[in-house]
């Protein structure tokens, strides 16, 4: 499972969500920035009062001391902003909505990872069961092909003797062509499933890998009441939706707090030098930002988030209903497949008895060879159907585990 790209991606998503929580929390703490600027200039003052010399006898004139050939200065500054009360945060010490939103997103991702893991397990299980089932059906299908080839030869001999019509030969010849196509397909299915399973398991080479051709037996059906009342309450899909409800709640809180004034402490310092003389100033203060009028934009945003919160709460019940429906469907399909297996087993038993009788009659010279061949063809076909149904039953239990999100496990 550790080689699954899906699970690897989910792991990185969780790491990213953790960093987003830290980033959201850091935005609530003091923010300090600094700047350094170097400037050079030459020329004269452009203000009309800056260039007039009022001390001259005539009361006016150009002040030549305002001319500068070239000068350079350095400016160094720093700015500190500390949000005291903003978007529900009080000095960054409480559970602010902005942080809780990111935490809810991470919770949803964690439970989604559980669902992803079950999806990967189901995919591997499905390919394994299909592949082993296909490999186990190769020999019976090849046996059916050999029987049909013998049947075609016998039909042709019987036709030459005038005992059968050409239409009879044509029918069995078409069956032989279909059987050959089916034999090719089942071999390709087995090969494709084997290679696909290696890829899903993250294995590069198939030289030293041998697939066990024995399928496990089906488990006992789990207690439905326990699944409904105990395990269903801990289903990852429900917990994902609970995280979505919490996220919607925090979104609502965040937008609601934005209706209130915000308070921030700020301070700045500036140091200026022309590399001969220096100057500096320091500024500190408190800024209170009060929302006065925005034509109802923020209030309507709050209402939208409130209704979204209510929708997510209602959706929680819908998720529970969907899970209950999936569980009922899984039990129904398990029953239908089990009933089909029971029916096929009974029919296979009768066909096996018919084959033994036909073979015995053929040995005694009572029945023609085609009777035994047809009886064996019917038995092989029924055994193939039975093998398909048994593999399908295993898939039904794998689907049940997937539907339960891993709260009930057949495959660890």
For each of these PLM feature ranges, what is it?
Residues 73-75, 126, 171, 281-283, ...:
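Transmembrane beta-barrel architecture of outer-membrane proteins
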Residues 35-94, 210-224, 253, 266-303, ...:
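Small/polar, glycine/serine/threonine/aspartate-rich low-complexity segments that form flexible
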């Amino acid at each position: 499972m550790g080689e699954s790209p899906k699970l690897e991606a989910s792991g990185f998503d969780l790491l990213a969500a953790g960093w987003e929580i830290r980033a959201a929390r850091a935005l609530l703490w003091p923010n300090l920035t600094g700047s350094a600027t170097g400037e050079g200039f030459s020329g004269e003052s452009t203000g009309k009062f800056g260039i007039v010399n009022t001390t001259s006898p005539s009361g006016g004139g150009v002040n030549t001391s305002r001319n500068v050939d070239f000068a350079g200065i350095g400016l160094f500054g720093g700015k500190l902003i500390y949000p005291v009360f903003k978007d529900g945060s009080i000095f960054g010490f409480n559970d602010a909505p902005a942080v809780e939103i990111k935490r809810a997103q991470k919770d949803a991702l964690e439970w989604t990872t559980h669902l992803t893991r079950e999806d990967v397990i189901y995919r591997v299980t499905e390919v394994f069961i299909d592949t082993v089932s296909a490999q186990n059906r190769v020999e019976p299908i090849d046996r059916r092909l050999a029987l049909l080839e013998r049947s075609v030869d016998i039909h042709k001999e019987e036709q030459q003797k005038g005992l059968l019509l050409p239409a009879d030969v044509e029918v069995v010849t078409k069956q032989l062509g279909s059987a050959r196509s089916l034999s090719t397909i089942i071999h390709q299915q087995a090969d494709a499933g084997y290679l696909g399973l290696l890829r899903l398991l993250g294995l590069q080479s198939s030289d030293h890998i041998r697939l066990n051709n024995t399928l496990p037996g089906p488990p006992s059906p789990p207690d439905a009441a326990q699944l409904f009342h105990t395990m269903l309450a801990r289903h990852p899909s429900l917990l994902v939706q609970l995280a979505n409800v919490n996220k919607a709640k925090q979104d609502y809180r965040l937008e609601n707090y934005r209706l209130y004034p915000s308070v921030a402490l700020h301070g700045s310092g500036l140091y200026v030098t022309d590399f001969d003389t220096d100057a500096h100033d320091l500024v500190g203060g408190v800024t209170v930002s009060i929302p006065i009028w925005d034509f109802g934009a923020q209030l309507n945003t709050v209402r939208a988030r409130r209704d979204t919160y209510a929708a997510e709460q209602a959706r929680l019940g819908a998720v529970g209903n969907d899970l209950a429906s999936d569980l009922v469907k899984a039990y129904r399909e398990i029953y239908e497949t089990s009933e089909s297996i029971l029916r096929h087993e009974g029919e296979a038993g009768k066909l096996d008895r018919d084959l033994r009788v036909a073979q015995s009659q053929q040995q005694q010279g009572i029945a023609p060879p085609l009777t035994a061949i047809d009886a064996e063809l019917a038995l092989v076909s029924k055994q193939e159907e039975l093998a398909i149904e048994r593999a399908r039953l295993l898939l039904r239990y794998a689907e049940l585990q997937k539907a339960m999100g891993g709260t009930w496990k057949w495959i660890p």
